[in-house]
Structures are given as structure tokens and as C-alpha cells.
Amino acid sequence: CLSDDFHPEQQRMLAVIYSQTAAEHHVAIKQTYSIVGDLIKKALSDTSWNAFTEDNARINELPPAIVIDVDETILDNSPYEARLIFNSTSYPEGWDDWCFEASAQALPGAVEFLKKVKNNGIEIFYVTNRRHKFESSTRENFKKLGIPISDEIDTLLMRDENGWGDDKYPRKQMIAKNYRIIFQLGDNLGDFVPLKENKIGPNERKRIADLYHCL
């Protein structure tokens, strides 16, 4: 049981302070992006390299792409979390305002990694559960940060768009029909597996997570 001295708001504040100031947090994220970036040439040269779990007989013929989550993988929402603490509120209170502000900063190493991916001729698909109404503001946020995003094809695939729900897997299946997915990046197991596999017990989640390297 929790002691009388336990204060949830204090714990939330400590978590936000850690994410914003800890060198270890900064380095861990930047190092992850660096490691994946170093694998780009290997992934491109090996045309059988496939980070998606479903096989495609045409995999060797398909152009390369990556699938990456947005919030807490690319964009740092810790200022929003701090705002919740200051206002003694909780998610989703104020989330719409935060997204429309388009003022999130990038997590360490994210922009450099994405530019490297694009410069190597790899398409980037941003698969996010932000609602479709935030598409314009999310694109604006990306452009402020210098994050590459296509103006020719829709590579920002959002919840509520085309009937998509919380499950990201159908969006990835669509991408995999026309691209060889060489990397998947995210901060949540649901960024990698179907929704039904993300709603299971802790031990089973750990087993599935061992198949992936989560950011």
C-alpha cells in the first residue's frame, strides 16, 4: 500500500524534470538514433532486410521506407506534461491546444536521423495516433524543426484518417504493399504490434518486446 507521504503530482513532476534535464535520458535517445542511423547502408544493401513481420514475395523489388511514431519518439511533449502538473489536470485536458500550438521541440538526435534517412533516398512514414484534425499543425511543427516530410504523397498517417482507429498495424500493412520497411521506431509496444497484442499481460508483452528494439 502507499504511504501517507506519497504524492502523485510530485512523482509526475520528478518524471518531467528527469526527461528534460537528465544527461542519461538525452544520451540514451540520441545513441539509439545514432545506432539505427549506422545501420542504414546495411539495410539498403541487403534487399531481403525487412523490419515488418509480414512477408511479401516482392520484397526485393520494393523501394525502402521507415515507419516511425511521432509523440515521444520524435516530438518532446514534456512541456505539455508540465502544463498538466501546473494546472492540476490530466490528459487529455489541453491536448488539443498543445497540438495546435505546433511548438513541440524534437527529441535528441531525431532531426539529424530523419534527414540522414531522407538523404539516403528512403521514404519516411509517420504513423501516429494523433487525430487527423491535427495534421496541418503537426506538419507545421515538423517544418519549424526541419523534419523532412513529403508534399507529394501522404506520409503522415493519422488516427481518424481513412477510417483508421487506434491500431497502427493496418496502416503499416498498407505501406508494406508498396515499400520495404527497413526500420520501425517507436516508444510503445503498440508502435510495433497489432493492438490485440498490445493489450495482454506484462510477461507476454515482454516476450513480444524481445522481438523488437524499442526507442
What are the language-model segments listed below?
Residues L2-D4, S34, R131-L215:
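C-terminal cap/substrate-recognition subdomain and adjoining C-terminal extension
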Residues P8, A23-K30, S34, F100-P108, ...:
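Soluble non-cytosolic domains of exported or imported proteins
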Residues K41, S45, Y80, K115-E123, ...:
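Sec-exported extracytoplasmic/periplasmic mature domains
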Residues D55, D96-F125, H132-K133:
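Short, acidic loop-to-helix structural element flanking the phosphoryl-transfer center
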Residues A82-E101:
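A solvent-exposed, charged loop/short amphipathic helix patch at secondary-structure junctions
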